[in-house]
């Protein structure tokens, strides 16, 4: 391959726009809001790192440690009068749950937890504030 061919391929590759990780931005905003509004519960809301791409070896290692597909993105380990915990699945507008996520939702709810799909910071604020009113 000549220098010019390599250079043209590099230019084509670098001219592609990077995908905007909108879901990541929404989740970061939600966590920031929660930690500012509820500092006494800051360590009770945590992320479940299921979405990262992994090698087959690392994926097997994580499954052995208990990682499950379909688990919600955020979990609030605080019960209220009606539920044991709040599980929040983040989705950017226009995206929907995968079948494995719907299966996990059913199991989660069957075991006394609240599960919600959130597509914006405003939705998250409503859900969390309403959930924590019922303590």
What function would you assign to each model-found segment?
Residues 1-135:
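Catalytic phosphate/metal-binding cores of nucleic-acid and nucleotide-processing enzymes, i.e., regions
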């Amino acid at each position: 391959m000549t220098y010019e061919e390599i250079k043209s391929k590099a230019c084509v590759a670098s001219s592609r726009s990077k995908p905007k990780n909108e879901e990541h931005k929404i989740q970061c905003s939600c966590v920031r809001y929660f930690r500012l509004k509820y500092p006494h519960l800051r360590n009770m809301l945590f992320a479940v790192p299921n979405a990262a791409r992994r090698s087959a070896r690392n994926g097997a290692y994580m499954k052995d440690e208990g990682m499950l597909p379909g688990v919600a993105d955020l979990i609030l380990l605080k019960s209220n009068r009606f539920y044991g915990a709040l599980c929040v699945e983040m989705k950017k507008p226009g995206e929907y749950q995968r079948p494995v996520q719907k299966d996990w939702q059913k199991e989660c709810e069957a075991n006394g937890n609240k599960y919600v799909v959130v597509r914006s910071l405003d939705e998250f604020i409503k859900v969390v504030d309403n959930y924590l009113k019922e303590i």
